[in-house]
Amino acid sequence: MKIALPNLSFPYITGISSALKTLEDTCDIEVFVWKAEKPLMDILDEIKPDLIFLYQHQANITLDLAAESLNFYYIAFSSSPLQLNKKPIAYITDREYVTNFINYQQNTLMVKPSANVAQIHNGQNSNTLQSDISVFNNDIQLGPEHLKILRWLTTQYNTKLFGPQKIAMPEYLGNTDIFERADAIKSSLISIDLGNFSCLDIAYLKVAPVVLNGVHELYKNFKSIKELEVILNNLIKDKERKEYCNSVYQDVIDSRTFYHRIAEIFQVIGDSERSQGSLNKLEELVSC
């Protein structure tokens, strides 16, 4: 099976793409990541994918024209059903739009925050990156509240800051690639999630996640620096860190990885064998 995905820099499509790449042998698939600027007809004609992932703005009459001579299925990331003759085999939508798909419930999935296991699995402890606390500003826009928290953290704890947004603090060490990010998380005792769902990657690496304005009861959540201080002092002193890390790690490997999302996708399009293959790959990684 040939599967094509656009190279859009959205965390969800990046996570799906990364995990699918690791499933090429397990699930007998070929994965192609195409430049989103390239005309859709060219992609369909050159690659001839069996399955293609498209965002709503990419799904247009080209699909109807291509379907006259090419045999393919597509999955649409969309906020509403598409008005095309060539219908998607499945939809993926955000929770806020799910009521728009009331007539498509059987083939509609919701976007769910997930750990990008394929990118972070090999994270290693690094002497250079060791810290009590790590913070990453990927996939969020830093505001006054975030900066206030970061300034407080850097005066109270051995903190290292990373990410594409430059921060005028000596503790800011710059942006990281996917491997450096995994190592930096693994080399800290605690990592702060400022609202970008990094808590799931953190939990998978068995590091303690602490989440700004989090709502999941299993995770350590805070809304103020005072609440954060109490949480950090307990975790740094190891009063509950090991038990906490084990519980959130189990939560992630039970249902919160992109391998689970891919299993759901294959299941909804009627491919139970590849669905199970995705879960088997996760089990293989976890057992290493």
Please identify what each model-predicted range represents.
Residues 7-15, 54, 140-144:
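A short, glycine/small-residue-rich beta-strand->loop->alpha-helix junction that serves as a flexible
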Residues 40-46, 234-235:
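Short amphipathic alpha-helix with an adjacent loop that forms part of the alpha/beta core around
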Residues 50-53, 73, 190:
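Structural motif
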Residues 1, 42-43, 120-128, 182:
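Short boundary motifs at domain starts and secondary-structure transition points
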Residues 3-33, 85, 161-273, 277-286:
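Catalytic binding pocket for nucleotide-activated donors in carbohydrate/polymer assembly enzymes
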Residues 58-156, 256-257:
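Catalytic core of nucleotide-activated saccharide and alditol-phosphate transferases
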